[in-house]
């Protein structure tokens, strides 16, 4: 975050990582969980795959499905301590080492 973000309370920071494939994403998600680092998949694996939208007609959504399978929301919030950022970074490095495709 920059000083621009720090001075604006209406800005909501977020960080989304996009990985090469779903298998890598799943590995990274698990390794981060093992380190106690939470991740988010804000839109599940595509809204059209959610039970609430199961009956809503839609056409093919290959880009949505591809991106939904490969992204993770990483922790980033106002007040994130330097210690927490370093812990997240260390967890990502461990995940990188474990995920061959990354």
Where are these regions (language model features)?
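PLP-dependent aminotransferase class I/II
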Residues: 1-102
């Amino acid at each position: 975050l920059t000083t621009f973000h720090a001075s604006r309370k209406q800005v909501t920071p977020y960080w989304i990582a996009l990985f090469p494939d779903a298998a890598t994403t799943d590995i990274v998600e698990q390794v981060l969980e093992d380190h106690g680092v939470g991740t988010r998949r804000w839109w599940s694996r595509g809204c059209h795959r959610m039970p609430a939208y199961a009956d809503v007609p839609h056409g093919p959504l290959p880009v949505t499905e591809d991106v939904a399978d490969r992204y993770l929301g990483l922790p980033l919030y106002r007040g994130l301590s330097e210690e927490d950022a370093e812990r997240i970074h260390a967890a990502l490095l461990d995940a990188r080492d474990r995920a061959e495709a990354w």
